[in-house]
Amino acid sequence: MSNDKSYCGFIAIVGRPNVGKSTLLNKLLGQKISITSRKAQTTRHRIVGIHTEGAYQAIYVDTPGLHMEEKRAINRLMNKAASSSIGDVELVIFVVEGTRWTPDDEMVLNKLRDGKAPVILAVNKVDNVQEKADLLPHLQFLASQMNFLDIVPISAETGLNVDTIAAIVRKHLPEATHHFPEDYITDRSQRFMASEIIREKLMRFLGAELPYSVTVEIERFVSNERGGYDINGLILVEREGQKKMVIGNKGAKIKTIGIEARKDMQEMFEAPVHLELWVKVKSGWADDERALRSLGYVDDL
């Protein structure tokens, strides 16, 4: 008699900004769908990553980092997106960084204590901990904070113990029909993924120079007769000086960003891509909830 049981559930990946949530998601999926950079607050939307293996389907929600600073409209909305992800999942992966513990970590923990879902604590970047003797006392301190389902020291970057996290997730998926076909890796549209790729390259090549007041709008995304895609991306900044920074000397910076973004798009979409980028000043958008709604920042709240 064949066993036709299937298992499926939602898992939220939460934590303060820049602890490695997106890197962990990409590692769990075996490919990149969530943008990563060393700059905090890179993830702005909840990304759904789907991993299907045989009878098991894990649907991961990669939340923006929760943080205490809520002054700007964009930060308020990002915190709301992250908090709402915690409420409707079967399991939570709480990511913290090595032996660091901050008020933002404490704030996330307090939200999790109020929740019903079991929590796996993923202690990331353990390979970067200089004093290994500090690790065990810190893990004991963390264990005393909450009744975690499990505590797993990991390195999302190298993949250390990520398979352990995946095994714990699989073991706790409820019996349910799969929500997505087995070949799906995300429920986000190609248009959305294109904007995320461009935004990652902006973060990568402009780094600390560029404030968070930059976003990307895909104005055109069409199939062409060559079997590929024609994509027009609009980069929105808040000030004229930022526009010059993005364009670079004689257009060198935006050219590099475009070349690297196109490479990633072609790999993701498995088709040729013709990409054109423009930069436009739209002052105050990060403070304007209406502007944020028009850019899709509240479609998932």
Swiss-Prot record:
* Single Gene Ontology MF annotation: ribosomal small subunit binding
Residue ranges constituting the KH type-2 domain according to the UniProt record = 206-283
Q: What Pfam families does the record point to?
A: KH_2, MMR_HSR1
Q: Where in the cell is it found?
A: Cytoplasm; Cell inner membrane
Tell me a GO biological process for this protein: ribosomal small subunit assembly
Q: Report the membrane topology from the UniProt record.
A: Peripheral membrane protein
Q: Where is this region: G4?
A: 124-127
Q: Where is this region: G5?
A: 154-156
Q: Which InterPro entries match?
A: G_ERA_dom (IPR030388), GTP-bd (IPR006073), GTPase_Era-like (IPR005662), KH_dom-like_a/b (IPR015946), KH_dom_type_2 (IPR004044), KH_sf_prok-type (IPR009019), P-loop_NTPase (IPR027417), Small_GTP-bd (IPR005225)
Sorted alphabetically, which PROSITE patterns does this protein's record hold? Answer: G_ERA, KH_TYPE_2
Q: Where is this region: G3?
A: 62-65
Annotated GTP binding lies at 15-22, 62-66, 124-127
Keywords from UniProt, A to Z, are: Cell inner membrane, Cell membrane, Cytoplasm, GTP-binding, Membrane, Nucleotide-binding, Ribosome biogenesis, RNA-binding, rRNA-binding
Region (G2) residue ranges read 41-45
The segment annotated G1 runs over 15-22
Which GO cellular component does the record give, naming just one?
Answer: cytosol
Q: What is its main location?
A: cytoplasm
Q: Which HAMAP family match?
A: GTPase_Era
Q: What does this protein do?
A: An essential GTPase that binds both GDP and GTP, with rapid nucleotide exchange. Plays a role in 16S rRNA processing and 30S ribosomal subunit biogenesis and possibly also in cell cycle regulation and energy metabolism.
Q: Which family does it belong to?
A: Belongs to the TRAFAC class TrmE-Era-EngA-EngB-Septin-like GTPase superfamily. Era GTPase family.
What protein name applies here? GTPase Era
Q: Which gene encodes it?
A: era
